[in-house]
UniProtKB/Swiss-Prot annotation:
Record: residues binding sn-glycerol 3-phosphate: K101, G131, K186, D239, S249, R250, N251
Annotated region described as Disordered, given as residue ranges: 312-369
Gene from which the chain derives: gpsA
Listed EC numbers: 1.1.1.94
InterPro entries registered for this protein in UniProt: 6-PGluconate_DH-like_C_sf, 6PGD_dom2, G3P_DH_NAD-dep, G3P_DH_NAD-dep_C, G3P_DH_NAD-dep_N, NAD(P)-bd_dom_sf
Signal peptide (from-to): none
Basic and acidic residues: bias regions: 325-336, 352-369
Top-rank taxon: Bacteria
Single GO BP term: phospholipid biosynthetic process
Name of the protein in question: Glycerol-3-phosphate dehydrogenase [NAD(P)+]
Organism (species): Leifsonia xyli subsp. xyli (strain CTCB07)
PANTHER family tied to this protein: GLYCEROL-3-PHOSPHATE DEHYDROGENASE, GLYCEROL-3-PHOSPHATE DEHYDROGENASE [NAD(+)] 2, CHLOROPLASTIC
GO molecular function: glycerol-3-phosphate dehydrogenase [NAD(P)+] activity; NAD binding
Catalytic activity: sn-glycerol 3-phosphate + NAD(+) = dihydroxyacetone phosphate + NADH + H(+); sn-glycerol 3-phosphate + NADP(+) = dihydroxyacetone phosphate + NADPH + H(+)
Length: 369
């Protein structure tokens, strides 16, 4: 496990509780020592006892030596700078798994794309994990699920097998684009939810933004080649609900501080860990413009961050149009002949997401256990 923040440590716990031999790499020696000897991470997971089998080190080579699977949980904007140091310790068949939910500034690349550029490994050796995964809840062993995605079904299954235990279940799919963009885009909607929460707006406003936000997410992801059903599952709607509704979400918290009147600079100073949504707004809008995708919610979040839109003015703009229009609850990709493709209803999204969480069955066609 490369990274010892809240999510990296929690996922290391998931893997260790599943019977795997796990070593965490922490940048700070004192944190590595606390995890290794005290089985605690008081900086990021206060009150959580870590598995006795879990080990930690501040030496990257020691952590990676002989590893069949390397999970990476670092701030998305620091990923590329850390990849070179990993190269000497990669085995010929090592699988690298991204736990990150962001896009790289400047390039707009997803984390799996950054890994593919920075490491000398085949695409079949790269996987991503996403879903409704608030770290502290999982560290407390509250049951949940996630999706493991890779272009190689065998790789996805191997990683999902490692990342399954009595309180955490992993499904699989091969839609890496949809799985990653679902995790990225829901962060932006969660910032919007936090803003209106900080302003003091109620549940009607938040429900409107979540519903319209899912349409924006699906439109964007489908424009870049995703299967719309992926956005209906755990990596899309499931993650969106969890992130928007929980005070444990860093993106929700960042938005709430903005809504309460704090500046973008002040919010960044107050956050003890990165809120990936803040860094992803600008590159996502650039990608949306490149494909002609309208994202009014994300655009207004950008305006709030820039200080050109007052937080109290965000909700009316998000939930109304200049003229009455039909409600579109389907993500659509328009082809050259004008026909809409890849449609998915909000009701269908809800049904598939809840089906996936039922023990032992009812998963969507795209996310298979």
């Amino acid at each position: 496990m490369i990274g010892a923040g809240s999510w990296g440590t929690t996922f290391a716990k998931i893997l260790a509780d599943g019977g795997n031999d796990v070593v965490v790499w922490a940048r700070r020696p004192e944190l590595a020592r606390e995890i290794d000897e005290g089985k605690r991470n008081s900086d990021y997971l206060q009150g959580i006892n870590l598995p006795r089998s879990l080990r930690a080190t501040s030496h990257l080579g020691e952590a990676m030596r002989g590893a069949e699977q390397v999970f990476v949980s670092l701030p998305s904007q620091t990923l590329r700078s850390n990849l070179d140091a990993m190269i000497p310790y990669l085995g010929p068949a090592t699988v690298v798994i991204s736990l990150m939910k962001g896009v790289e500034k400047g390039t707009g690349l997803r984390m799996s794309e950054v890994i593919a550029q920075g490491l000398p490994i085949d695409p079949e050796q790269i996987a991503v994990v996403s879903g409704p995964n608030l770290a502290l809840e999982i560290a407390r062993e509250q049951p949940t699920a996630a999706v493991v995605s890779s272009v190689s079904p065998a790789t996805a299954v191997a990683v999902a097998t490692s990342a399954t235990n009595r309180y955490f279940r992993s499904f699989v799919n091969t839609d890496v684009i949809g799985t990653e963009f679902g995790g990225v885009l829901k962060n932006l909607i969660a910032v919007a939810i936090g803003i209106v929460d900080g302003v003091g707006y109620g549940e009607n406003t938040k429900a409107s933004i979540i519903t319209r936000g899912l349409v924006e997410m699906t439109d964007f992801a489908v424009a870049y080649g995703a299967d719309p059903q992926t956005l209906s599952g755990l990596a899309g709607l499931g993650d969106l609900i969890a992130t928007c509704e929980s005070p444990l979400s860093r993106n929700n918290t960042a938005g709430r501080l903005l809504g309460q009147g704090y500046s973008f600079t002040d919010v960044v100073k107050q956050m003890d860990q990165a809120a990936e949504g803040l860094a992803s707004v600008t590159p996502i809008l650039s990608l949306a413009e490149a494909r002609g995708v309208e994202m009014p919610i994300v655009r207004q979040v950008s305006q709030v961050l820039a200080g050109t839109l007052a937080p109290k003015d965000i909700a009316p703009h998000l939930t109304t149009d200049d003229e009455p229009q039909g409600e579109r609850t389907r993500g659509e990709r328009t082809t050259d002949d004008g026909q809409g493709q890849g449609r998915t209803s909000v009701w269908g999204s809800l049904k598939r997401a809840f089906d996936q969480l039922r023990d032992g069955g009812g998963s969507s066609r795209r996310d298979r256990p």
